Amino acid sequence: MAGSALEALLVGIGAIPGAWLRLKAVNHFEPMVPKKHWGTFAVNVIACFGLGLVLALYQSCSAKTGLALLIGVGFFGSLSTFSTFAVELLNELRAGRPFVSLVLALASIAAGLCAAGVGYGLGAYG
């Protein structure tokens, strides 16, 4: 199997459980706090942590390229959902709640950066 076909297969295999987990997480939070965006927020922060960890392990050469594609790009890439995040921000703006949109955007970016940093730190130094 050619390298690019194998890489695509690894990403696809990793994406299946990541997308499934995202669906489960978002559906889990929705009945408890409707329209509060906690499901999207949670999966994006978890994905940032995981991708930071995988990146650090990959850069230290303790993770192989195939494993990084499977877990980093496939699983954590499909777990995170920037498009849903953007639509949720847009919906808050359209509903006349710019402050909610701003707080959600800033909190998501700050939490995502912190989570990626912690994941990277654990992978690089832990």
From Swiss-Prot:
> Which cellular components does GO assign to this protein?
plasma membrane
Where along this sequence does the record place binding of Na(+)?
77, 80
Q: State any GO BP term from the record.
A: cellular detoxification of fluoride
Give the regulation of activity.
Na(+) is not transported, but it plays an essential structural role and its presence is essential for fluoride channel function.
Query: What does the record give as the reaction this protein catalyses?
Result: fluoride(in) = fluoride(out)
What keywords appear on the UniProt entry?
Cell inner membrane, Cell membrane, Ion channel, Ion transport, Membrane, Metal-binding, Sodium, Transmembrane, Transmembrane helix, Transport
The keyword Magnesium is annotated on this UniProt entry:
no
Q: Name one GO molecular function term.
A: fluoride channel activity
The record's annotation in Pfam families points to: CRCB
Q: What is the documented function of this protein?
A: Fluoride-specific ion channel. Important for reducing fluoride concentration in the cell, thus reducing its toxicity.
Question: Which family does the similarity line name?
Answer: Belongs to the fluoride channel Fluc/FEX (TC 1.A.43) family.
The UniProt entry, under HAMAP family, shows:
FluC
| Name of the protein described by the UniProt record | Fluoride-specific ion channel FluC 1
Which organism encodes this protein?
A: Synechococcus sp. (strain CC9902)
